Design a protein with these regions (language model features):
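Conserved active-site-adjacent core of cysteine acyl-enzyme catalytic domains
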Residues: 33-93, 98-126
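Charged phosphate-binding loop/patch that engages nucleotide di/tri-phosphates or the phosphate backbone
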Residues: 124-140
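Extracellular and analogous surface-interaction loops
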Residues: 21, 68-72, 136
Length: 140
């Protein structure tokens, strides 16, 4: 899976969905905007519903939020909430994608300022919870 760099300061949710959907940021941004989802809307990084709505547009199923127990307990494909904190009593976080494939695990982090968007520095990331995601197969 390939990383997608967020083109807006607060577009990590959109970029994470773009990576999962195999599309680029601008296309995911257009889809999000058509659904009434915008990167500067605080709900995008303080609620899961906007990301869930965008995932549904791309036929990607999302499970419930599950507190992180360990990296090894994560499903093979998941959204993670890192940099979780509270501001004024409201939770905020940075969306990233966890991938386990071909005997390798990594995190796709869309933050533009990073030197690499494929991360394996698991000790530095502190996920609060994960959401299992999977592509819905078309019926044929």
């Amino acid at each position: 899976m390939k990383p997608v760099v967020q083109l807006e300061r607060t577009g990590c949710g959109i970029a994470s969905v773009a990576a999962l959907a195999g599309t680029n940021y601008r296309q995911a941004q257009r889809s999000a905007n058509q659904l009434g989802i915008f990167a500067d809307d605080r709900r995008l990084w303080s609620e899961t519903q906007p990301v869930r709505t965008l995932l549904k547009r791309y036929r990607i199923r999302a499970g419930t939020e599950i507190p992180l127990v360990s990296w090894s307990a994560l499903p093979d494909l998941a959204l993670l909430a890192i940099k979780w904190h509270r501001e004024g009593g409201r939770a905020f976080w940075h969306w990233v994608v966890f991938v386990r494939e071909h005997d390798r695990s990594y995190v796709l982090d869309s933050k533009r300022a990073l030197n690499t968007h494929v991360r394996t520095d698991f000790g530095r990331m502190r996920p609060k919870w994960s959401i299992r995601v999977e592509k819905i197969r078309s019926r044929r």
